[in-house]
UniProtKB/Swiss-Prot annotation:
Subcellular compartments: Lysosome membrane
Subunit structure: Component of the BLOC-one-related complex (BORC) which is composed of BLOC1S1, BLOC1S2, BORCS5, BORCS6, BORCS7, BORCS8, KXD1 and SNAPIN.
Domain of life, per lineage: Eukaryota
Gene: BORCS7
Name of this chain's protein: BLOC-1-related complex subunit 7
Length: 106
């Protein structure tokens, strides 16, 4: 009877160890999955940060180009103002010459 009791005890112990081992393997698998998800999330964050940095460089280039264009437009505006003033003076002189010509022809 003693041998049977020992065999039963060993069988129960074996089942208990199997149960604990299965539980530990399941927990370990769950932890590996969680770790993998975290690594992937970190990898994605790094990818997003890289993309954000590239976008900022593109925006900075666009801003610098816009500033350059605005400076050029300011120069063109100044030149157009000078030309407009010159044209206005010529129109006034033309009007004066027209008056003088009319006066001479009378």
């Amino acid at each position: 009877m003693m041998a049977t009791g020992t065999a039963d005890s060993q069988a129960r112990f074996g089942q208990s160890v199997k149960g604990l081992l299965t539980e530990k393997v399941t927990t370990c698998g769950t932890d590996v999955i969680a770790l993998t998800k975290q690594v992937l999330k970190g990898s994605r964050s790094s990818e997003l940060l890289g993309q954000a940095a590239r976008n900022m460089v593109l925006q900075e280039d666009a801003i610098l180009h816009s500033e350059d264009s605005l400076r050029k437009m300011a120069i063109i505006t100044t030149h157009l103002q000078y030309q407009q003033e010159a044209i206005q003076k010529n129109v006034e002189q033309s009007s004066d010459l027209q008056d003088q010509l009319n006066h001479l022809l009378k």
